[in-house]
């Protein structure tokens, strides 16, 4: 190697979380994960992302698994590698803001069960929605990584990103992630952004993107050359398409350069061999849609994430209005502008997309308004980077007064009430958190868990006479 300073790029492996969430609807089971943990642990990853995001909901709802049990089993298996999770700020892993006591307890239990790095983001980049989670992570001595939800638009200048990065560092974050959920960050823009951020903050910078638009590997190359510290990749059987660039490809790309990871390709090949049959089985069963493996250039042309494109298509199909697809795509940026130009990530992408569909199909803008659109305009999700369109706001919410405080400031502590509601099913401390996020799904799971242990199906019980089937 030339006499250049060695600065190996660090790699976060997403195969146990975002890769299968992006390609097979988060359906990888704990049983499928555990046999390969020993080999994954030998690679030398900066971290393995294995929890949070949609895995919590999917484990309970579709796999009848306890997500906490999965985490404990993974922690037992990974002796040398840090475990990472994705956390939706004040929304935790759910779809609404929770009271601070629930957020703090969730962070505490995540760390206690084995999570080392907590990646925390907010769909509006409203830092007020992140503060409680960051402070809780600091208190638990977990690594608090705050993610910038990357997007494009007039408001999102280099100055915007450097200013918010500085505020994140001051807030107590241990590192920053550029979270490019839609694959919109182009290679040369990555050079500019990473260079500017490295000049602004001292904490490490991680880049997370998706291959949806086809540019992700080139973006990683330019970002690493510009000084990014960490990149997120997926083992090749679940890489590319809606997932991340392939781990093996990025490792080979940086071989014999100052950024050489030093990873063993033979070991990576053995890991890929393990996951390939799981991928093939998902293809055969239809769980893995071949469309999720290709490049969707519309993502770049319309600045709309891949998941949002498929969502719009299915909404229009239901209404027998597929011919309105391009009208809706043109309406999306207009609605986004009306709503303060939020990044298009869960849940803001669904809110903007659905409203755009209504506007086109009704033949009049904002004739029909969703509850979620009203809530954004009422400040219930937090502050947007730009002001709302005042005419649209007036039409949608009338004389209702928007809130300007942090949404969670209006919430009373919830834990005690939640504990009371699910006490009869509680088998571990963490159960109250499962119930807090998904009450109905949790109750169904608790009953299933009980039935597995007692071999009594509660649904088949004659409760009136206290009789149970054998």
Identify what each model region corresponds to.
Residues 1-24, 71, 76:
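N-terminal amphipathic alpha-helix/helix-capping segment at the start of soluble metabolic enzymes
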Residues 11, 19, 40, 120, ...:
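Conserved, mostly hydrophobic/aromatic
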Residues 41-59, 289-299, 303-470:
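Terminal or standalone catalytic/regulatory effector modules within metabolic enzymes
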Residues 47, 52-169, 176, 183-187:
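Active-site beta->alpha loop and helix N-cap motifs at the rims of alpha/beta catalytic domains
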Residues 120-123, 180, 226-243:
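Glycine-rich phosphate-binding active-site loops on the catalytic face of alpha/beta enzymes
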Residues 156-168, 213-229:
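Catalytic cores of alpha/beta
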Residues 239-261:
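C-terminal helical cap(s) of enzyme catalytic domains, especially alpha/beta-barrels
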């Amino acid at each position: 190697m030339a006499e250049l300073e060695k600065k190996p790029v660090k790699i976060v492996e997403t195969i146990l979380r975002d890769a299968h969430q992006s390609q097979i609807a988060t359906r990888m089971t704990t049983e499928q994960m555990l046999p390969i943990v020993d080999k994954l642990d030998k690679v030398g990853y900066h971290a393995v992302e294995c929890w949070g995001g949609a895995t919590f909901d999917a484990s309970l709802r579709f796999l009848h698994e306890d997500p906490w049990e999965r985490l404990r089993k993974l922690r037992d298996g990974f002796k040398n590698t840090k475990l990472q999770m994705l956390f939706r700020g004040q929304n935790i892993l759910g779809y609404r803001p929770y009271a601070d006591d629930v957020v703090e307890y969730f962070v505490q239990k995540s760390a206690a069960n084995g999570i080392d790095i907590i990646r925390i983001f907010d769909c509006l980049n409203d830092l007020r929605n992140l503060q409680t989670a960051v402070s809780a992570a600091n208190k638990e001595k977990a690594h608090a990584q705050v993610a910038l939800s990357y997007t494009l638009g007039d408001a999102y200048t280099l100055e915007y990103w450097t200013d918010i990065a500085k505020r994140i560092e001051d807030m107590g974050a241990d590192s920053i992630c550029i979270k490019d959920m839609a694959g919109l960050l182009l290679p040369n823009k990555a050079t500019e952004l990473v260079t500017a951020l490295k000049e602004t903050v001292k904490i490490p910078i991680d880049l997370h993107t998706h291959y949806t638009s086809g540019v992700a590997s080139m973006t990683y190359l330019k970002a690493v050359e510009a000084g990014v510290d960490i990149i997120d990749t997926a083992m090749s059987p679940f890489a590319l398409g809606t997932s991340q660039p392939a781990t093996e490809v990025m490792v080979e790309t940086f071989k014999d350069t100052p950024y050489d990871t030093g990873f063993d390709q033979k070991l990576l090949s053995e890991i890929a061999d393990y996951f390939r049959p799981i991928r093939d089985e998902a293809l055969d069963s239809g769980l893995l849609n071949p469309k999720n493996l290709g490049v969707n250039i519309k993502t770049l042309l319309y600045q709309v994430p891949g998941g949002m494109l498929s969502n719009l298509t299915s909404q229009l199909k239901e209404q027998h209005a597929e011919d309105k697809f391009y009208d809706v795509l043109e309406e999306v940026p207009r609605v986004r502008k009306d709503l303060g130009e939020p990044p298009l990530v869960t849940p803001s992408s669904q809110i903007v997309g659905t409203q755009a569909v209504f506007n086109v199909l009704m033949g009049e803008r904002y004739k029909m308004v969703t509850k979620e659109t009203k809530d954004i305009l009422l400040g219930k999700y937090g502050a947007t980077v730009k002001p709302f369109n005042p005419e649209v706001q007036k039409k949608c919410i009338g004389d209702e007064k928007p809130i300007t405080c942090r949404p969670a400031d209006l919430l009373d502590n919830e834990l005690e009430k939640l504990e009371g509601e699910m006490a009869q099913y509680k088998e571990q401390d963490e159960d109250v958190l499962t119930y807090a996020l998904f009450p109905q799904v949790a109750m169904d799971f608790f009953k299933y868990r009980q039935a597995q242990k007692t071999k009594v199906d509660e649904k088949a019980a004659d409760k009136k006479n206290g009789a149970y089937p054998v």
